[in-house]
Amino acid sequence: MIIREQLATIIERMQEPRKCIQVLAGPRQVGKTTLIKQFLTTCQVPTTNLNADEVVPNNRNWISEKWQSVRVQMKLMGQSEHILIIDEVQKIDDWSAVVKKEWDYDTFHDINIKLILLGSSRLLLKDGLTESLMGRFELIRIPHWSFTEMREAFDFSLEQYIYFGGYPGAATYVNNEKRWRQYMRDAIIEPAIDRDVLMTKRILKPALLRQLFEIGCAYSGEIIAYNKIIGQLNDAGNTSTLANYLKTLDEA
């Protein structure tokens, strides 16, 4: 089992006095949830691990109800400290305002609940953190797996790493490229575009954004002029539109 360096960061920050919310942010399918599972095996403090994936988005009370349950548990069990973990928190409408309210309540009343947030949508996390939680969080970036990690875990060659990338979930399919492409499209690309971009940003030309993504993949690692891209796109509009869409894709 690969132990990523970010695990030590999580452990260290959870051992410190309560000060900031810890936010694990990174691309899909790079092991954020696995890191939390590894952390839980080492943690001696009472924890509550929640996932908002199946919660109805407009159920804003869900976060507050779960949070209050932790407070009640701490009081009944005589706990001086508790770690609350919420995965896919960005799927709850107005999540950041609710988290701010509950976090500030605990701060005012000296309730020692430490908080870890995870999310697969960088756009939604970014919007929520900048809107309501400025000054209250620290970001722990979870990047793609490095070549060293992929080599150790899956015996990747450098050529395989350059071609297939640092996605551990897809690594078992590299000997069947058709299946690998299907997995990448269904598990990573489509959710990133459909859920993280089209559902959170006002995109007037979604077909153009998809074309731009495909061209970006074809020219990965190359420098290419906007004018050249326009010539390969249908209904491309102007270069400022392309620049905005590229920025959105980069943030997703």
Could you tell me what each predicted segment is?
Residues 1-17:
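N-terminal pre-Walker A segment at the start of P-loop NTPase domains
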Residues 24:
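Hydrophobic anchor at the beta1->P-loop junction of P-loop NTPases
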Residues 32:
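Conserved lysine of the Walker
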Residues 35, 39:
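Hydrophobic positions on the alpha1 helix immediately C-terminal to the Walker A/P-loop
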Residues 49-80:
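Short glycine-rich substrate-engagement loop in P-loop NTPases that contacts/grips substrate
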Residues 96-117:
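Conserved catalytic/switch belt of AAA+ P-loop NTPases
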Residues 123-138, 154-155:
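Short regulatory helix/loop adjacent to the ATP-binding pocket of P-loop NTPases
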Residues 144-252:
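Interdomain hinge/linker elements that couple catalytic modules in large macromolecular machines
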